[in-house]
């Protein structure tokens, strides 16, 4: 396992090749979340990253909250966390760590807006649904066959479908989805900014880079960038 790393309020990360990090001011080292990460394998031999989360209180005592999470997001209060463990989404409080609350089962990944009013759930089949705060049921399926998604700070969820050499990039706001571009190689979210890469012409390894501050209107910023 790695050394303990600080995870402040609204810190979010997911293991694997796609990793999104949203780190805000963590404040004191006490009354804060920390995590370790380590490599794991599923029954088919696929390698991925898992996380153990701890809360260090003002008395300098470390309490383990979660073991074996594949994705987590620290809630704005900095004392509770949303996490995916064994394909289910839980919320765990530092003040009651032995009683995690099940939010939803059959969850591969999730994205939540800053106030956790809207939580987008992707199941193990790649279907995306919305769980609104206080709602007893999930929305209907918004998008299908999604392989990767990431949330922007403005509450826009970006998604890409299953692909080999290029997929369809879409955005979701509420229960409405919008196709942004086709044949997209990959995309990343950096908090307030998103970028995606699209193959440039017939040459291998060269991509045009498009960027956006709202997750819907993208502008070509770099042509024929070499990505190794």
Regions found by a protein language model. Give the residues of each.
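Sequence signature of WD/YWTD-type beta-propeller architectures
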Residues: 1-228
């Amino acid at each position: 396992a790695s050394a303990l790393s600080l995870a402040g309020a609204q810190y979010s990360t997911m293991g694997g090749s796609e990793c999104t990090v949203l780190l805000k001011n963590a404040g004191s080292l006490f009354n804060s979340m920390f995590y370790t990460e380590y490599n794991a394998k599923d029954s088919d031999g696929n390698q991925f990253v898992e996380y153990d989360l701890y809360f260090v209180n003002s008395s300098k005592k470390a309490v383990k909250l979660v073991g074996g999470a594949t994705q987590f997001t620290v809630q704005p209060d900095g004392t509770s966390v949303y996490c995916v463990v064994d394909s289910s989404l839980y919320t765990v409080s530092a003040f009651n760590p032995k009683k995690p609350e099940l939010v939803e089962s059959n969850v591969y990944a999730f994205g939540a807006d800053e106030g956790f009013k809207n939580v987008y759930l992707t199941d193990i089949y790649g279907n995306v649904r919305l769980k609104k705060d206080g709602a007893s049921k999930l929305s209907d399926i918004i998008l299908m066959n999604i392989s990767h998604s990431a949330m922007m700070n403005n509450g826009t969820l970006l998604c890409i479908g299953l692909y080999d050499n290029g997929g369809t990039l879409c955005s979701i706001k509420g229960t409405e989805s919008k196709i942004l571009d086709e044949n997209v190689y990959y995309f990343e979210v950096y908090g307030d900014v998103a970028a995606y890469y699209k193959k440039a012409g017939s040459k291998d390894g060269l991509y045009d880079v498009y960027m956006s501050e709202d997750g819907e209107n993208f502008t070509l910023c770099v042509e024929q960038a070499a990505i190794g």
